[in-house]
């Protein structure tokens, strides 16, 4: 269990986090130089990180990654996706220099519109399962997202990945 290992092996965990952070920096530099219009940091397991570790394990690596990108002259916008941290998005947006933040489908879109900083572009957050349901319920969900975010920068997207059952 990775979380137990994090608790039991402080120094080794920090070393691993440093390796992953540096690899991410290298990868994103290559993506940017290859012509990517925007860069996205997927932290799909952010919700598994206990709140008191979030600064060290989620926020500080993002700070380091974006600082390194800017130090390399990379100007593309960076979107962070700390899946499942709910109201922790406030600290994430305030403490990291992300240009945008991905919202998973569990985030209340009205809360996000009212509480997250307006200078940060929001991305998401249609429930991927709504694509399977389709029809009027899917259209209502789409309309709710578009309505809540009509007056701020927004990238319409799913709140997480497409499932294998999704029709083509």
Labelled PLM ranges:
Residues 1-168:
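Active-site loop segments of alpha/beta catalytic cores
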């Amino acid at each position: 269990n990775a979380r137990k290992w994090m608790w039991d092996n402080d120094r080794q965990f920090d070393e691993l986090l440093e390796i992953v952070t540096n690899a991410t920096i290298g990868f994103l530099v290559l993506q940017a130089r290859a012509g990517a219009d925007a860069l996205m940091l997927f932290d799909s397991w952010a919700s598994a990180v206990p709140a008191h570790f979030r600064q060290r394990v989620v926020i500080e690596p993002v700070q380091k990654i974006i600082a390194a990108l800017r130090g390399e002259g990379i100007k593309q916008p960076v979107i962070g996706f700390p899946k499942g941290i709910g109201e922790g998005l406030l600290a994430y947006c305030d403490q990291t220099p992300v240009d945008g933040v991905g919202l998973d489908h569990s985030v209340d879109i009205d809360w996000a519109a009212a509480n997250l900083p307006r200078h940060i572009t929001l991305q998401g957050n249609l429930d991927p399962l709504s694509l399977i349901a389709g029809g009027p319920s899917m259209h209502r969900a789409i309309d709710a997202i578009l309505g809540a975010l009509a007056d701020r920068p927004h990238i319409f997207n799913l709140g997480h990945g497409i499932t294998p059952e999704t029709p083509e």
